[in-house]
């Protein structure tokens, strides 16, 4: 897929939403006679993609991650999430994949989508089970979903990996307090 533009890869994956989002950010290609969203999708369906190039994959992945980071800083969490999704298409290493998943989890969390944030955080923990940040992301998503007991477990797992992590310790205290309050409301 590398050696192709992100918009071509999105078209090849059948992601019209991603093509529409990338369209205003992509310079027109002289190889496409119909520079439109439908034209790009049609071209890729008919001609396919160019062979992969690892260096180009790394470059495109880095560009998408940078755009995602910028979108996140601007509060454009959906755009950031979609850019991280695009970066996943460009052969990240296992560690880079975990980082992208952690960042996409935070983006979807800030966007208010707890289920998607939890899904990414869970995959992140599978990819890097000894990474405290993965535990933190999972706990944060569980907090948004009001699954406080499980959030406590995730934060505690992270503290086992990094006992001096103040963010995890604070998050665990907040989760324990939320769990306690939830139990008292049930009575």
Where are the regions that the model predicts?
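Alpha-helical linker/edge segments of TPR/alpha-solenoid repeat scaffolds
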Residues: 16-20, 28, 32, 46-58, ...
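Helix-start (N-cap) detector for alpha-helical repeat units in TPR-like alpha-solenoids
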Residues: 61, 95-98, 132-133, 166
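Structural marker of alpha-solenoid helical repeat scaffolds
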Residues: 90-93, 127, 161
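Ankyrin repeat A-helix N-terminal signature
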Residues: 9-15
